């Protein structure tokens, strides 16, 4: 009985610790988006270029089987990887040309075309941090 109680206690501590490491990301992305980042079977990376004032995909790469994707997924949902103090609460919208990459998390290649979670990435200028934002949601984080 003591061993079972010890196991339940350890599991509870682990869950609380894990939640503490990801709480701000969950608040920023939302639970559904964070789940898509962590578990979507199909992931694409699109290179963006500004065309007629709009960000346009000029190159698409399927990274679903890429080495290190599991680490990237994890990094995208860990609070420590972002500068939460730099995030503008209601700052100005970045211009279309500021966004360098788009990541699509979807159920399939066909779904990536129109569905799925979309994250836009601004890699920033040299010596400056970048930004990440969820397409269709307000706010961004550095």
Question: Language-model segments: which ranges?
Answer:
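Function-determining sites in protein domains
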Residues: 1-142
């Amino acid at each position: 009985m003591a061993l079972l109680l010890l196991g339940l206690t350890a599991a509870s501590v682990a869950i609380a610790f894990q939640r503490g490491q990801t709480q701000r990301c969950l608040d920023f992305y939302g639970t559904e988006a964070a789940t898509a980042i962590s578990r979507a079977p199909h992931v694409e990376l699109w290179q963006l270029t500004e065309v007629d004032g709009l960000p346009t995909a000029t190159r698409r790469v399927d990274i679903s089987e890429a080495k290190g994707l599991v680490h990237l997924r994890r990094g995208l949902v860990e609070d420590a990887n972002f500068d939460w103090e730099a995030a503008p609460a209601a700052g100005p919208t970045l211009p279309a040309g500021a966004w360098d990459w788009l990541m699509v998390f979807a159920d399939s290649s066909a779904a990536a075309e129109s569905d799925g979670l979309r994250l836009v990435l601004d890699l920033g200028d040299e010596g400056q941090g970048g930004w990440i934002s969820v397409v269709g949601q307000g706010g961004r984080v550095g």
